[in-house]
Swiss-Prot record:
PANTHER family: ATP SYNTHASE SUBUNIT ALPHA, MITOCHONDRIAL (PTHR48082:SF2). It comes from Azorhizobium caulinodans (strain ATCC 43989 / DSM 5975 / JCM 20966 / LMG 6465 / NBRC 14845 / NCIMB 13405 / ORS 571). The keyword Translocase applies. Coiled coil: none annotated. It comes from the Bacteria. Belongs to the ATPase alpha/beta chains family. This is ATP synthase subunit alpha.
């Protein structure tokens, strides 16, 4: 046997080169323990925070806790079939969802999978659910109105495109009803052939609600013809906590597609209290230290990074916008609890709904004194500013006097007049569900209220007067409504014509 020196040196070199190279346990891990929707996984050394991983049975999860010797994974689905010792694969992708127009008219879960039985989603693009919000430079101040069709809100607490306005109140105070009316009111803007700058696409995120409630909501959207410009993201009460935590982020990513492409979108998170509860559950199971009310320390950051993504972009960035209406449920009207105060401080104002008002029949049950819109007034059209400026002051005076009036019966004429006017304005701001009003119709109705046309009417005739007057305006004075809509202000001529129309109608109504 011939031994060549060159061969020996080559073998030795190869062995020296490979010396000390152990096999890396990085791309595949092993389940150490599993329970309560959380898996502890050994291995996966190079996994990224927020990365999607896949278990042996195809169930997916998200790596949240990266510790020295193991990874804490939250499971998107049931953990029943996951057992100790099973393998876990990295996917290499951060959690993302499909986005685009293909989602309009569909109901999806928090991962963007269709749950409405209408076949697969036709999406051309996928986006990460958790991305950084736009910085200061790409933004522009809010200046275009986002009409909800509700007089109490559009007149007193106006919302602009790109604003974050919180809807807060106890259970059963009509929070979802306000959000639903806001979606339905966008129908005239989303007609075929309308310019993109006018349209407003809607994303509704249902977190921790009953399936029957979500089904009812979708049915209403369908019946009213609003589903075609809406996306519904549902993580219901029976879904695992990670899905409820993820749904608002997924919905925001879908809304951002429109914002970043020069279009306008509205996202409604219904509701963020349930998302916070789901996040608390996940955090405690992952053994993160609890803080106030057992919420983790970063629950403020959870909501701030979510809501900061709603923005109005400047013209260089396409001038798109994403408006957010987060919903928070309070317990016994306690606005000073942890999550409500957090979200109030993040948003640009709040619409405060009160159960007492709701039971008095004032619906929408907006407490005008506690509700504010910090940026919306610059988005309000001039015509509405002209008529609504008065109503706010008069209602504030009315509330103050109404408290005193309970104690004394001998009131002077001016006080009596103010109380009279306030009661009628309160009556005027009532509105039935599914009957949103166009902004020009709101303007003429509020003009009638602030100019004394309702003062001598019995309270129970105010709604009747309003309905009759609107019918008269639509049938005989449509040109005046069109003028207000196009010019967006009440000129001297418009005011003269409106006064004439009101005088004529008031005579015939009496």
């Amino acid at each position: 046997m011939d031994i060549r020196a060159a061969e020996i040196s080559a073998i030795l070199k190869e062995q020296i080169q490979n010396f000390g190279r152990e096999a890396e346990v990085s791309e595949v891990g092993q389940v150490l323990s599993v329970g309560d929707g959380i898996a502890r996984v050994y291995g996966l050394d190079n996994v990224q925070a927020g990365e999607m991983v896949e278990f042996e049975n195809g169930t997916r999860g998200m790596a949240l806790n990266l510790e020295i010797d193991n990874v804490g994974v939250v499971i998107f689905g049931s953990d029943r079939d996951i057992k100790e010792g099973q393998t876990v694969k990295r996917t290499g992708a951060i959690v993302d969802v499909p986005v685009g127009r293909g989602l309009l008219g569909r109901v999806v879960d928090a991962l963007g999978n269709p749950i409405d039985g209408k076949g697969p989603i036709e999406a051309t693009e996928r986006r990460r659910v958790d991305v950084k919000a736009p910085g200061i430079i790409p933004r522009k101040s809010v200046h275009e109105p986002m009409q909800t069709g509700l007089k109490a809100i559009d007149a007193l607490i106006p919302i602009g495109r790109g604003q974050r306005e919180l809807i807060i109140g106890d259970r059963q105070t009509g929070k979802t009803a306000v959000a639903l009316d806001a979606i339905l009111n966008q129908k005239p803007l989303n007609v075929a052939g309308a310019p993109e700058s006018q349209k407003l696409y809607c994303v509704y995120v249902a977190v921790g609600q009953k399936r029957s409630t979500v089904a009812q909501f979708v049915k209403v959207l369908e019946e009213q013809g609003a589903l075609e410009y809406s996306i519904v993201v549902a993580a219901t009460a029976s879904d695992p906590a990670p899905m409820q935590f993820l749904a608002p982020f997924a919905g925001t990513a879908m809304g951002e597609y429109f914002r970043d492409n020069g279009m306008h979108a509205l996202i409604i998170h219904d509701d963020l209290s349930k998302q916070a509860v789901a996040y608390r559950q996940m955090s405690l199971l992952l053994r993160r230290p609890p803080g106030r009310e057992a919420y983790p320390g970063d629950v403020f950051y959870l909501h701030s990074r979510l809501l900061e993504r709603a923005a109005k972009l400047n013209d260089e960035n396409g001038a798109g916008s994403l408006t957010a209406l987060p919903v928070i449920e309070t317990q016994a009207n306690d606005v000073s609890a942890y999550i409500p105060t957090n979200v109030i401080s993040i948003t640009d104002g709040q619409i405060f709904l009160e159960s007492d008002l709701f039971y008095q029949g004032i619906r929408p049950a907006v407490n005008v004194g506690l509700s504010v819109s910090r940026v919306g007034s610059s988005a309000q059209i001039k015509a509405m500013k002209q008529v609504a400026g008065k109503i706010k002051g008069e209602l504030a005076q009315y509330r103050e006097l109404a408290a005193f009036a309970q104690f004394g019966s001998d009131l002077d004429a001016s006080t009596q007049k103010l109380l009279n006017r306030g009661a009628r304005l309160t009556e005027l701001l009532k509105q039935s569900q599914f009957s949103p009003l166009k902004v020009e119709e709101q303007v003429v109705v509020i003009y009638a209220g602030t100019n004394g046309y309702l003062d001598n009417l019995p309270l129970n005739k105010v709604r009747e007067f309003e309905a009759g007057f609107l019918l008269a305006m639509r049938t005989q004075h449509q040109d005046l409504l069109d003028t207000i809509r196009t010019s967006k202000e009440l000129s001297k001529d418009s005011i003269a014509n409106l006064t004439k129309a009101l005088d004529a109608f008031a005579k015939s109504f009496a």
